[in-house]
């Protein structure tokens, strides 16, 4: 199962490296605002408890670990890796995801994989497993049944 899927972008490796390094410099200067980034991650249906949980989690994020994940995503070429998958695959995407647009990520991945099913969740942002955990759990159970 994939959620908030990013399949990389069309930028060159050099452009992606510059983007990563710009984030590193921003974090080193203390300007990344981890706790304030919930606005970019959550959709309109997120509850007050979800907002609080995400803000708390973001503030506790280890910048070094976060940047390792950013570097991995920037270097990964998801379509070539994913095309080897032959099992049924569930892709869950929030319709209000402002981090990874469905049109340039989840929809392209689903189209490239014959055994993939894409589910778009209304009112949901980049974190469907957090924002709509019960719905996502139901989707997983149905997918595995």
Where are these regions (language model features)?
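Short, surface-exposed alpha-helical segments at coil->helix boundaries
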Residues: 17, 51-52, 102-107
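Short alpha-helix in the alpha/beta-hydrolase fold that links the catalytic acid
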Residues: 71, 87, 102-111
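Short beta-strand/loop motif that positions the catalytic acidic residue
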Residues: 85, 91-93, 97
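Flexible "cap/lid" loop of the alpha/beta hydrolase fold
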Residues: 1-29
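Catalytic active-site module of serine/aspartate enzymes centered on a nucleophile-bearing elbow/loop
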Residues: 114-145
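Amphipathic alpha-helical segment in the mid-to-C-terminal domain
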Residues: 63, 102, 129-133
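Acidic beta-to-alpha connecting loop that harbors the catalytic carboxylate
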Residues: 95-98, 123-125
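Conserved alpha/beta-hydrolase catalytic His-Asp/Glu region
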Residues: 11-15, 29-84
């Amino acid at each position: 199962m994939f959620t908030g899927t990013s399949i990389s972008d069309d930028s060159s490796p050099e452009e992606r490296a510059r983007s990563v390094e710009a984030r590193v410099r921003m974090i080193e200067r203390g300007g990344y605002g981890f706790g304030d980034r919930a606005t970019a991650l959550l959709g309109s249906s997120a509850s007050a408890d979800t907002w609080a949980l995400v803000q708390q989690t973001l503030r506790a994020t280890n910048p070094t670990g976060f940047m390792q994940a950013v570097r991995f995503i920037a270097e990964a070429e998801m379509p070539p890796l994913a095309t080897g998958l032959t099992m049924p695959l569930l892709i869950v995407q929030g319709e209000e995801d402002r981090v990874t647009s469905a049109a340039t990520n989840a929809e392209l991945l689903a189209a490239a994989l014959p055994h993939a099913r894409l589910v778009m969740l209304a009112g949901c942002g980049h974190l469907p497993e957090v924002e709509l955990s019960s719905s996502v759990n139901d989707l997983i159970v149905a997918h595995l049944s």
